[in-house]
Every structure is written in structure tokens, then in C-alpha cells.
UniProtKB/Swiss-Prot annotation:
Name this polypeptide is given: UPF0324 membrane protein BA_5405/GBAA_5405/BAS5024
Record bears the keyword Transmembrane helix: yes
Signal peptide (from-to): none
Major location (coarse): membrane
Subcellular location: Cell membrane
Species in which this protein is naturally found: Bacillus anthracis
UniProt-listed InterPro entries: UPF0324_pro (IPR018383)
Pfam family, any one: Cons_hypoth698
Protein keywords: Cell membrane, Membrane, Transmembrane, Transmembrane helix
Superkingdom, natural source: Bacteria
Amino acid sequence: MEQTLVIQKKKRFGFSQGIGITLLIAIVAKYLAELPFLNIMGQLVIAILIGMVWRAAIGVPHDAIAGTNFASKKLLRFGIILLGMRLNLVDIAKAGPKVLVIAAVVITFTLFVVYGLTKVFKVEKKLGILTACGTAICGAAAVVAIAPQVKAKDDETAVGAAIIAILGTIFTLIYTLLYPVLGFSPYGYGVFSGATLHEIAHVIAAAAPGGSTAVDIAVIVKLTRVTMLVPVAILIGVWFGKSEGSKEKRSWRDLPIPWFIFGFLAMSAVHSLGIIPEVVAGYIVVLAYMLIAMAMAGLGLNVEFKTFRKLGSKAFVAGLIGSVCLSVLGYVLVYALGFM
């Protein structure tokens, strides 16, 4: 009996230790994300990279794994639900139908192109789907939201999120350098940035040279893409379930429904209706990013650099080519739809 109590106490301590490590990493990532250049990467990206470095340099105690796994799965879902508070559907509606059109075209095009490229490069199917969704919708948040739909492993999820983060940072720097020669008005440049970059942090950083006009519309366009996360997650779950059905004999009733995504949508509706004051909504968004950063840290703590090299090289190339295609499409759409 006494031995059982000791074991249980040890497990509880290990669980708390795992949660504590992810929280520490998330806090450090938040402050690092406020520094020059690192603010381009954002808190989520930095958290997953710190997690990978922590594992390589220090290691993770065996008893702490339960806590890091809890953060990477349970806290992740809660964080995504709260992240819905970032959306204001009224602002998106005011932006007009053209914004919805450009978001729908960009997402559809990118999903097919990037996933097609991952097949050409023989990337593992689940990682290919995650790379495509992260590029098309909202970066690392999309990767971790779609992962349960395709039953992705932690290392696949972490590698997918890291790939998207690195690509987004590269393209953010390129956009900033090219802004003077692209020929866009600040408004058009904001639409272009919001329609083609990966993370919200990337969008804000890239649009900054265009001033507040560019940043404001860039965020609205980006958040319009984020709203597509709900239908895309459901469609991916249905499609993946059917594609695997012949092997697993799964029925439509067995398909995973991402209930936390509906929570995300519900929170965005609450924000849009003005039920919660903007100040409170802002704090909720900060909490959401903190929880998702803890999840990213948990994922990073479960991945070794050799795993990233093994799984990520071909997926990175596919994502790179796909991102170039996305940028070209975005450039064409800005001109075609009159966002000058």
C-alpha cells in the first residue's frame, strides 16, 4: 500500500514537472518573441524550437512525459477554443466579399498544390496534409488543429509546425525587402501579405512597412483565412477517413469530429456579438497563445533533431515551392480583384 502511494506521488510530481517545463518554455518564448527579428517568428514557433533544443541539451525525465503529452494534446484544444476570441466576424464581413473570395481561392489552391508536391517528393501522407494545411490556413495553429483529424504522431505534428514556421519567417523577410518594388498601395500590400503568409505574426511583421493601413487589412484577410479552419478540418477528417476506410473499414460514424473547432467558432461568435469587453477579449487571446505555446513546447520536447532531418527535408522543399506558388497567386489576385 505504501509503495503504491509512493508510485502515485511520483507520477503526480512527474506530471506537474512536465506541465511546469512547458509553461516555463512558453513564458520564455513569449518574452523572446518581443525582441527584434524574433518577433517575426512569434511565440508559438519559438516555443517549439526551444522544446527541441531542451530535449537535445537537457533531456526530458521519463515521469514528466505524461505532463508534456497533456500539454500537447489537452491544453492545445483548450487554447484553440480560446483563440476564437481573436476573430471578429463583423470586421471580416465589413471587408467585403472580395476578401472571402481571395481567402477561399488561396486556401483551395494551396491545399491541392502543396499536398500534390508532397506526393511528388514522396513525403509521408500525414505530414504532407499537415504541411499543406499549415501553408494554406494559419501556420502552426492549423497544423496542430488538423493533426487529430489524420491521427498524426507527435513528431509529424512538430515537424510540420516547424517547417511552416521556418518558411513563414523566410517569406516575411523577403516580402519586407520586396515591398518597395512590388508596386502595391499600402492597402494592396496588406491584402497580399494577409492572403499569402503563414502565421499571424508573419503577417503583422511583413505588413508593417506599409503602415497601419496595410497591417489592419492584412490581419483581417489573414483572420478570414483562419475562419476556414472549421470547414477544412471537417472536410479533411471526412476525406482522410474515407481514404483509409478500405484498410481500416471505418464507417462515416467513426470519423473524428473536431469538437474543439466548434468551440473556436463559438468563441469568435461571442466576440463578434460584443458580449465580452475588448480588454477582456485581449487577455483571453494572450491566454490562448500561452496554452498553445505550452502545447508547442510539449511537441518540441517529444522530437529529436534527427527526426526533423529525416522527416522534414522533403516536406520543406515541397512547402517552399508551394509557398512560392502561393505568393505568385496572391500577387495575381491582388491585381485581378482591384486591391491596389
